[in-house]
Swiss-Prot record:
This is 3-isopropylmalate dehydratase large subunit. Belongs to the aconitase/IPM isomerase family. LeuC type 1 subfamily. InterPro entries: 3-IsopropMal_deHydase_lsu (IPR004430), Acnase/IPM_dHydase_lsu_aba_1/3 (IPR015931), Acoase/IPM_deHydtase_lsu_aba (IPR001030), Aconitase_4Fe-4S_BS (IPR018136), Aconitase_4Fe-4S_dom (IPR036008), IPM_dehydratase_rel_enz (IPR050067), IPMI_cat (IPR033941). Binds 1 [4Fe-4S] cluster per subunit. It is an enzyme of class 4 (lyase). Its EC number is 4.2.1.33.
Amino acid sequence: MPRTLFDKIWDTHIVRPQTAETPAVLYIDLHLIHEVTSPQAFTELRRRGLKVRRPDRTLATMDHSTPTTPRGPDGIIPVVDAQAAAQLRQLEQNCADFGIPLFALGSERQGIVHVIGPEQGLTQPGMTIVCGDSHTSTHGAFGALAFGIGTSEVAHVLATQCLIQNRPKTMEVRVDGRLKPGVTAKDIILAIIARYGVGAGVGHVFEYTGEAIRALSMEERMTICNMSIEGGARAGMIAPDDTTFQYIAGRPFAPKGAAWDEAVAYWRTLPTDDGAVYDRTITLDASQLTPMITYGTNPGMGIPIDGRIPTPEELPDQAARQALDKALRYMDLRPGQPLLGQKVDVVFLGSCTNSRISDLRMAASVLKGRKIAEGVRMMVVPGSQQVKKQAEAEGLDRIFREAGAEWREAGCSACLGMNDDKVPPGKYAVSTSNRNFEGRQGPGARTLLASPLTAVASAIEGVVADPRKYVG
């Protein structure tokens, strides 16, 4: 019987099958942890006298609470927030006590958990991957089944290397056509969520297929899968291919020699079989897309960059009209208003959605030789120390600095308004991150989600700007 990519991975990881009364028990290949969602899990292990079942299949990094302030003269990244410092110390102690490898603050491998997994070669096709973070779906770009879990589940995986789960349904998200200049992977996923809604994927795993998806680089595929959760899905996946294998080859934790050949042979069996049936299929024509931007307080409130905010009369029901009214009151925007020309106070280039080297190259290519507008604060936060090192080797940091932007250390940063990486109350931020909820980037912050190209164009002009004028 033909099977989907999801079916193949799920079926090979079942420890105990799902029944009418009980969920399935799944084996977990890779467990990633960080300082925010793991402390209570370790407390539970100590309370029950349990060990970590597979410390060799567990990896920790510091990312959420880490300051991104440039290093001091001593080369140390200063941690001034007491709560952040306590979380970082606790993770360090927990990893030492339980024998878990840690990429600590200041180390050359530290970074956002969903950036370092792929760049180190830990993320591989066919794996089950979990982390106490909703954007674990990022790793699905490699043909892995990857999803976020809660703190109690973190404890369960630490103790057993297994997880209790109900089998989700499958949804094909087919994207055909070719992207036009100035339109990016970020615009694809924002368009999908805007068209189908933040609840479209509830109870499903997305598998992205089609000509436009196959043409994307691995880092672009990660951007797509990263925001699957914003579309309501449990996870997002893309079948592995030669692009995937070329990205993984030679990375520190990738298979070597004969093991590599065996791995690739297995990975080639994973793509969805001809004739396999998805529970649902939705489509998008990439050739018709323009740059996208959000206007409201959930990622589904998005419009083309040259569009207008919808009016209540255009919405299908009273609930949608009420949500629009509430969002626009928070954002201080009006129905029918265009966003082009809307004043911008902060631009954030970073997050697990868009902080990889290709994102920084894309932004720097537009910013080179230009200045950001007076009064705009632009924060550029690489996703990992490895990304930062590569960007500096290419001179990208100089381009950002000379334009007037801040070049910061690696971490989650302004995505969730940590430390001093916040958007002031009432101010507008064009952000390459994944969430625009009320207060997400700081109390009263007003977030407009967009691609790196749109973010940089807006930084240059000081207002929401169409990036297509800056690209060939």
